[in-house]
Amino acid sequence: MKAFTRLTGLVCPLDRANVDTDAIIPKQFLKSIQRSGFGPNLFDEWRYLDHGEPGMDNSIRPQNPDFVLNFPRYQGAQILLARENFGCGSSREHAPWALDDYGFRVVIAPSFADIFFNNCYKNGLLPIVLPAEVMDRLFAGCEASEGYRLTVDLAAQTVTTPQGDSFGFDITEHRKHCLLNGLDEIGLTLRHAGEIKAFEDNRRQTQPWLFR
């Protein structure tokens, strides 16, 4: 998993509430268990004018010129602004995979669906909860200024605007440690590989019948 420490990135505003996981990555793209390759189909039904299916050449599909991800000013965005209850709907880990594969490292919203929120941390995507009034200020700043960038400092737990306004956010120490060090659940387990092996070797000696 990629580590996250500090990022100054271009911001894209998705001014919609209750964006569900089927909107983030539609169900027809869930057949793959690879974590990569979902970026071109992020927000597929809003991003394109036709119906998308796996294997299509997205470079020749007609794009929706009114969808924010297709605006030239937001190309290369790494921080997504969203509204309340982002990531609601069915549980699918493909949703954070698609956001990450597109290039987003941070999603900032007033609230998230619980399962999506947890899945973000497991896949190196930082979900940040800020009050609705702060989100209104960030949306206004982003829409008023082309090339609007925010600085997200995980160690300091702050989001800072180009004007120098800084907003703190909460994160558990465990999740913070994992993101700062690029550790997912497998990575955390592998850090104790020696201890696990020693435990298993001891069990083979003391409880050999378990291994017959």
Swiss-Prot record:
Entry keywords, A to Z: Amino-acid biosynthesis, Branched-chain amino acid biosynthesis, Leucine biosynthesis, Lyase
Example of a GO biological process term: L-leucine biosynthetic process
Catalytic activity: (2R,3S)-3-isopropylmalate = (2S)-2-isopropylmalate
Gene Ontology cellular component annotations, sorted alphabetically: 3-isopropylmalate dehydratase complex
InterPro entries linked: 3-IsopropMal_deHydase_ssu (IPR004431), Aconitase/3IPM_dehydase_swvl (IPR015928), AconitaseA/IPMdHydase_ssu_swvl (IPR000573), IPMI_Swivel (IPR033940), LeuD (IPR050075)
Highest taxon of the lineage: Bacteria
Molecular functions (GO terms): 3-isopropylmalate dehydratase activity
Pathway(s) per entry: Amino-acid biosynthesis; L-leucine biosynthesis; L-leucine from 3-methyl-2-oxobutanoate: step 2/4
Top EC group: lyase
CDD domains per record: IPMI_Swivel
EC number: 4.2.1.33
Record's subunit section: Heterodimer of LeuC and LeuD.
Function summary: Catalyzes the isomerization between 2-isopropylmalate and 3-isopropylmalate, via the formation of 2-isopropylmaleate.
PANTHER family: 3-ISOPROPYLMALATE DEHYDRATASE SMALL SUBUNIT (PTHR43345:SF5), 3-ISOPROPYLMALATE DEHYDRATASE SMALL SUBUNIT 2-RELATED-RELATED (PTHR43345)
Similarity section: Belongs to the LeuD family. LeuD type 1 subfamily.
Name by which UniProt lists this protein: 3-isopropylmalate dehydratase small subunit
Organism: Laribacter hongkongensis (strain HLHK9)
Lineage per the UniProt record: Bacteria, Pseudomonadati, Pseudomonadota, Betaproteobacteria, Neisseriales
Gene designation: leuD
